């Protein structure tokens, strides 16, 4: 596995300064979620969100997602932080947004949730295993049912779909194209190219 992260060198009045590519993009208020969602990743993303809020609470944050999902509680930590901070968070799906990845994608600011055309989106109900005494298994079963209800309500809030539709779709793995995700309400737009930036000098 190649873990090499490219470096970017910039000229400053104090000489050259180098950044890894993700740190340089963070300066532009761009955050990446790539791979599994787990506690360490969630802590890093939450910290970046909070840092960017402290830098400028009124400027949007761009959150790029390419994730197969992961630990539900870790994903909910990111979700809650996205809702908590003052800047609007725009989400962009690149590659895939599955399971908790799809929940974080749809949790972006309404009207600012995007996907590239060949991305894959998947939603499903949470899964888990339990072992031990019968009472312990019963407790775990109640907890995962409560968690399923919580996640369903989050999807209802952000997609505008009624609860019975969400419950039916979430019953099994449901894969969608970017266009299908837009029709369902998970995203707002499928984008092929970044919009052209107006030339300030022309005004």
UniProtKB/Swiss-Prot annotation:
Signal peptide: none annotated. The keyword Amino-acid biosynthesis does not apply. The active site is at residues 99, 124. InterPro entries: ClpP, ClpP/crotonase-like_dom_sf, ClpP/TepA, ClpP_His_AS, ClpP_Ser_AS. GO terms for cellular component: cytoplasm; endopeptidase Clp complex. Pfam families: CLP_protease (PF00574). Its EC number is 3.4.21.92. Keywords: Cytoplasm, Hydrolase, Protease, Serine protease. It catalyses: Hydrolysis of proteins to small peptides in the presence of ATP and magnesium. alpha-casein is the usual test substrate. In the absence of ATP, only oligopeptides shorter than five residues are hydrolyzed (such as succinyl-Leu-Tyr-|-NHMec, and Leu-Tyr-Leu-|-Tyr-Trp, in which cleavage of the -Tyr-|-Leu- and -Tyr-|-Trp bonds also occurs). HAMAP family: ClpP. Cleaves peptides in various proteins in a process that requires ATP hydrolysis. Has a chymotrypsin-like activity. Plays a major role in the degradation of misfolded proteins. Belongs to the peptidase S14 family. NCBIfam families: clpP, PRK00277.1, PRK12553.1. This is ATP-dependent Clp protease proteolytic subunit. It comes from Paramagnetospirillum magneticum (strain ATCC 700264 / AMB-1).
